[in-house]
Amino acid sequence: MLNTKVIECIPLNLYLSAKFLVLLQVTSHNEFIKTNREDIRLYLKREDLIHPYISGNKYRKLKYNIKEALTQNCESLLTFGGAYSNHIAAVAYAGSINGLKTIGVIRGDELAAEIPNNPTLTFAQQHGMQFKFLSRSSYRNKMSNTFIEELNNQFNNFYLIPEGGTNALAVKGCEEILTDNDSQFDFICCSVGTGGTLSGLINASKSHQRI
């Protein structure tokens, strides 16, 4: 008898989130994908169906960060990204539904005049995000102590979320992607950007599973 291998694929760039979902435990279902291999069962974890505007892993990454921002009584969320960053759009929407102002530090100062032609920045602006555009050379130094101090002087009481949303709280949120129902899978596959989703999956996986 063939040893059946079960593979779960988790998409990275999708959309999700809803008002105060930060307080909820959200799960997604596994959709069977038919293949031409009888010894393989392939499933797609539908994190994209959690919400239309905050993508699956974006919701997971933001959940505990927003909770922490509210706990610290911060007035706004500040983060970084490019012209077509799903993270920028997700932060803008999540902030708006949680009563937090949002600030996006955007790579490319030429984009300041192109907001109407950019669907991502237009969406973020429509949900209240304020932009600070940087030249591409200046953007490379965005996490320097000098620049962070400049941001503090300009925007005051903000909660800083790294580019792509990955930090310890983001990893904690991504650990919730896998549930007890997913323990049947032998392999768990996902695409990788900043590594936050992958780290959460590794932490939450069972000893028999390979990531």
Briefly describe each language-model feature range.
Residues M1-I211:
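PLP-dependent amino-acid enzyme catalytic core
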